[in-house]
Amino acid sequence: MTGLERQLTEMLESAVVASGYELVGLEFIRAGEHSTLRIYIDHENGITVEDCAEVSHQVSAVLDVEDPISVAYSLEVSSPGLDRPLFKPAHYEQFIGQEVNVVLKMAVANRRKWKGEIHSVDGEAITLTVDGQQEEFALSNISKANLIPKF
């Protein structure tokens, strides 16, 4: 998580929670002149398009007042989806036993991309079962992690 993403999470979480939703996480993606702030929300009853519109309205109001982003960007609010991104230690704990794709900031054993089943979480690191072997990764070294949907 970048410094800006951390700042945005702290700034927006209370608005999302006050609307009755969980802020799963967010990503600020810079792609040349077209940046995107993508916010993932969830609710025990699932997420509808109307839910996304409501949260978008609330979040936009906060962003308009605080103005933390200095470049033009698009705001997207969505459910985490089947390939749910994992941002917090609690997310990894919630999905112990599920298969994930993990991209690391710094390579471990000459690899940045890993695929395995979440075996355990200790707060600072996760352990994946990869090809029958246990591999431990510091949460601070994880750039991106997504569930692999089962069909």
From Swiss-Prot:
Family matches, as HAMAP family: RimP
Statement: the UniProt record of this protein carries the keyword Cytoplasm: yes
Family assignment from sequence similarity: Belongs to the RimP family.
GO cellular component annotations of the record: cytosol
Gene for this chain: rimP
Locations listed in the record: Cytoplasm
Domain of life: Bacteria
Keywords annotated in UniProt: Cytoplasm, Ribosome biogenesis
Protein name: Ribosome maturation factor RimP
InterPro entries, alphabetized: Ribosome_maturation_RimP, RimP_C, RimP_C_sf, RimP_N, RimP_N_sf
Organism: Vibrio vulnificus (strain YJ016)
Primary role: Required for maturation of 30S ribosomal subunits.
Pfam family of the protein (one): RimP_N
